[in-house]
């Protein structure tokens, strides 16, 4: 038989090595193609446990406390067919040694940000000559050796991230002098992969490669006594010039953050309820909160430049800034001070933020007349993070050009836009700016901080302005702390600035923002003091309605609750409705036109609601209901032409969104949700069922009002012409939050409405 030239390198009569105590619990993730791997590992003294990639969870894997992790070959693509493999690599990187073969190596490449693609040739069971760097798995091996390949995919040179180095390669068989990546290695972490099959009978020194790996015990090369930043004495050959590893350097803080986030996101994606499919299902159910267009909102500002106000508890460069900051409370301050965008850092380790911060910020801005857009400030590298941001209420996300390949950046950019979010694309150099402009980004942020050295140069933004089309919004990011920092930006066409640390430390947020942007604190909405709305409730006749309106009452209440003494039948209610809608407010009672509130300003929800309830030309008719069916309430509203509905029982809070007119809702002093925005137009503080003449405890009223600076209420309970002014005045500064007063029994005599008392009550309130 003719000699084929093939050499069988398998161990024909293998001798099992002594038990390795350091490899006492090797976990092999089987990607449905592991063949006899466990046998080869056992031959080198390892104790091996094998698990299919879809038959163990990451939590179960962690609980088994492996000493080393091996990822096997397998069919398909690493991003779709490797099961738990990638999540395991992300979690265990830096903790224990990891070795990947074929698809296992491809998982390593994609986990750290690289890409795999077709090699241009399909080799299954073919041998090639390997060139390697003599380190890691190749330590002590000859310069060139034969290996066996079973693959059509491999890592691509252009996408290998800085944290990885190419450790071996083979030349293509097409005489192109191009090579294919056969091995990669993390520069700091004990993570290594090979594209070929060491266990094949046609691969030389396969057992030695396994042995070299099983000697490793620590999660870093340094921990294993390996210093790959210096040329190894055992290196017998170098990888070809096309695959030469990039110059090693100290892992930058940005790379460390990215590596950590990749690991965390990989784990999160395996948790039931947080998996990509779970998020997509929630999005498909239209559960993402309403959004505002990011570029359009950036163009709206009460100041010469738009402000992107950042919520940041800490940073790698400054350490702890505001550990105890309440993100939603901070967001409301920023919004009321005129911010166009609120940036929420959601990275937990270095910046001490979370996606829950963003969710709470979005909820806190509900009901503002022109709420700021919300930016998820995060190290984004996966569509999953963008979808997560949208579901939490983000209007835009940050994409950092420095950390993304052009291919990945483009993919993430268009995915974000598909969710209705124009991203903020961050750059720092002319090269990165060109990428952002070519991408077609509508909003580009120039980071004045070098993310490698963390040095700040405020001139960075200025130097890049001439590369940007006039239609593009340019934002200056980082290092801005005072008015002098932004003066040049105004002249150069910069449209917005992002400020974080200085804002978090400011004693008076509104004053600092006004001074910073060269405006005035008057540029943002300032509510002028008006006397409270007057609501005359329990109206039972046309005469009483007419007297109340002519005295200057704003709201005429009629009781629609069957069985109550003040309940009016529909025919009487219709006649009262006609009176309310036909009699104008008396001269001098028409409120002045609102002045000094720029269109870009965000008005607090309850302030806006109070304006709506103060009709410019007539009183409004309020129908009072208590624990009655929603259908009945809606029917009566249409039949009687009610301008406002008052819910005085235990109706669901959500009904306010189902009723087509403003809703006043009664609350007791101990009831929750009194200050919940975007449901009831105004809360009404009252005792019991109302109409009893029982005064509320003044100190408890004060406590309720002091809990929320944006709360506005209608005050009821025992008020009459003789005490209403004094009760409101005793509340001091908190009395400004009483935007309406409600009276029923306080304007009655012997159970009937007293027209004189009605007039006296209105007059007393107008004097406040």
UniProtKB/Swiss-Prot annotation:
Residues 253-517 are annotated as: Indole-3-glycerol phosphate synthase. Keywords: Amino-acid biosynthesis, Aromatic amino acid biosynthesis, Decarboxylase, Glutamine amidotransferase, Isomerase, Lyase, Multifunctional enzyme, Tryptophan biosynthesis. It catalyses: N-(5-phospho-beta-D-ribosyl)anthranilate = 1-(2-carboxyphenylamino)-1-deoxy-D-ribulose 5-phosphate; 1-(2-carboxyphenylamino)-1-deoxy-D-ribulose 5-phosphate + H(+) = (1S,2R)-1-C-(indol-3-yl)glycerol 3-phosphate + CO2 + H2O; chorismate + L-glutamine = anthranilate + pyruvate + L-glutamate + H(+). Its EC number is 4.1.3.27, 4.1.1.48, 5.3.1.24. Residues 25-223 form the Glutamine amidotransferase type-1 domain. GO terms for biological process: L-tryptophan biosynthetic process. Pathway: Amino-acid biosynthesis; L-tryptophan biosynthesis; L-tryptophan from chorismate: step 1/5; Amino-acid biosynthesis; L-tryptophan biosynthesis; L-tryptophan from chorismate: step 3/5; Amino-acid biosynthesis; L-tryptophan biosynthesis; L-tryptophan from chorismate: step 4/5. Pfam families: GATase, IGPS, PRAI. GO terms for molecular function: anthranilate synthase activity; indole-3-glycerol-phosphate synthase activity; phosphoribosylanthranilate isomerase activity. SUPFAM superfamilies: Class I glutamine amidotransferase-like, Ribulose-phoshate binding barrel. GO terms for cellular component: cytosol. Residues 533-768 are annotated as: N-(5'-phosphoribosyl)anthranilate isomerase. The active site is at 102 (nucleophile), 197 (for gatase activity), 199 (for gatase activity). L-glutamine binds at residues 74-76, 106, 152-153. Trifunctional enzyme bearing the Gln amidotransferase (GATase) domain of anthranilate synthase, indole-glycerolphosphate synthase, and phosphoribosylanthranilate isomerase activities. PANTHER family: MULTIFUNCTIONAL TRYPTOPHAN BIOSYNTHESIS PROTEIN, MULTIFUNCTIONAL TRYPTOPHAN BIOSYNTHESIS PROTEIN-RELATED. This is Multifunctional tryptophan biosynthesis protein. It comes from Aspergillus awamori. The gene is trpC.
């Amino acid at each position: 038989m003719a000699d084929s030239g093939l050499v069988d390198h398998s161990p024909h009569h293998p001798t099992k090595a002594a038990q390795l105590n350091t490899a006492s619990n090797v976990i092999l993730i089987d990607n449905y193609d592991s063949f006899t791997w466990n046998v080869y590992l056992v031959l080198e003294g390892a104790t091996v446990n094998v698990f299919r990639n879809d038959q163990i969870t990451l939590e179960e894997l962690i609980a088994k406390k492996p000493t080393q992790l091996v990822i096997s070959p397998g069919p398909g693509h690493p991003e779709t067919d490797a099961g738990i493999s990638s999540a395991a690599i992300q979690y265990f990187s830096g903790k224990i040694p990891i070795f990947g073969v074929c698809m296992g190596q491809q998982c390593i490449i994609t986990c750290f940000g690289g890409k795999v693609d077709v090699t241009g040739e399909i080799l299954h069971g073919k041998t090639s000559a390997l060139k390697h760097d003599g380190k890691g798995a190749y330590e002590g091996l000859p310069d060139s050796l034969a290996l066996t390949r079973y693959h059509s995919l491999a890592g691509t040179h252009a996408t290998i991230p800085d944290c990885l180095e190419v450790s071996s390669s083979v030349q293509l068989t097409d005489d192109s002098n191009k090579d294919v990546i056969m091995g990669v290695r993390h520069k700091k972490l004990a993570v290594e992969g090979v594209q070929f099959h060491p266990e094949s009978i046609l691969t030389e020194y396969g057992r030695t490669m396994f042995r070299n790996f099983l000697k490793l015990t620590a999660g870093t090369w340094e921990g294993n006594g390996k210093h790959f930043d210096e040329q190894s004495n055992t290196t017998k050959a170098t990888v070809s010039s096309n695959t030469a590893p990039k110059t090693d350097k100290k892992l930058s803080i940005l790379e460390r953050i990215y590596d950590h986030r990749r690991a965390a996101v990989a784990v999160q994606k395996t948790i039931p309820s947080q998996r990509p499919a779970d998020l997509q299902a929630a999005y498909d159910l239209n559960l993402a909160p309403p959004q505002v267009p990011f570029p359009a909102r950036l163009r709206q500002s009460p100041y010469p430049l738009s402000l992107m106000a950042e919520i940041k508890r800490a940073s790698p460069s400054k350490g702890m800034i505001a550990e105890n900051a309440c993100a939603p409370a901070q967001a409301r301050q920023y919004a009321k001070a005129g911010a166009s965008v609120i940036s929420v850092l959601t990275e937990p380790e270095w910046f001490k933020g979370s996606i829950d911060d963003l969710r709470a910020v979005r909820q806190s801005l509900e009901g503002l007349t022109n709420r700021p857009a919300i930016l998820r400030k995060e190290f984004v590298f996966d569509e999953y993070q963008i979808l997560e941001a949208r579901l939490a209420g983000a209007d835009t996300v940050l994409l950092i050009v420095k950390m993304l390949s052009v291919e990945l950046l483009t993919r993430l950019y268009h995915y974000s836009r598909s969710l209705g979010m124009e991203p903020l694309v961050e750059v720092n150099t002319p090269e990165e700016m060109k990428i952002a402009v070519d991408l077609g980004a509508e909003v580009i942020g120039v980071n004045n901080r070098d993310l490698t050295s963390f040095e700040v140069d405020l001139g960075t933004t200025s130097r890049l302005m001439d590369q940007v089309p006039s239609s593009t919004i340019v934002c200056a990011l980082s290092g801005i702390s005072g008015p002098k920092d932004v003066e040049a930006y105004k002249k150069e066409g910069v449209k917005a600035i992002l400020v974080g640390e200085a804002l978090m430390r400011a004693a008076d947020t509104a004053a600092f923002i006004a001074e910073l942007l060269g405006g005035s604190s008057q540029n943002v909405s300032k509510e002028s003091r008006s006397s409270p709305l007057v609501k005359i409730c329990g109206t039972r006749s046309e005469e009483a309605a007419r007297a109340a309106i002519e005295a200057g009452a704003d709201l005429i209440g009629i009781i629609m609750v069957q069985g109550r003494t003040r309940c009016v039948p529909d025919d009487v209610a219709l006649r009262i409705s006609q009176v309310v809608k036909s009699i104008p407010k008396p001269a001098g009672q028409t409120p002045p036109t609102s002045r000094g509130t720029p269109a870009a300003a965000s008005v607090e929800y309850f302030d806006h609601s109070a304006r709506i309830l103060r009709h410019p030309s007539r009183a409004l008719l309020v129908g009072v209901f208590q624990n009655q069916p929603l259908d009945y309430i809606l029917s009566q509203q249409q039949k009687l032409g009610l301008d406002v509905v008052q819910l005085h029982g235990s109706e669901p809070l959500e009904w306010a969104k189902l009723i087509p007119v403003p809703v006043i809702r009664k609350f007791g002093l101990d009831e929750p949700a009194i200050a919940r925005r975007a449901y009831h137009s105004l809360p009404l503080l009252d005792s019991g069922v109302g109409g009893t003449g029982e005064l509320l405890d003044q100190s408890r009223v004060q406590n309720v009002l002091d809990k929320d600076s944006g709360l506005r209420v209608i005050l009821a309970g025992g008020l009459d012409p003789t005490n209403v002014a004094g009760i409101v005045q005793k509340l001091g500064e908190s009395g400004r939050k009483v935007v309406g007063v409600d009276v029923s029994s306080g304007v009655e005599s012997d159970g009937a409405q007293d027209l004189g008392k009605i007039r006296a009550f209105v007059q007393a309130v107008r004097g406040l």
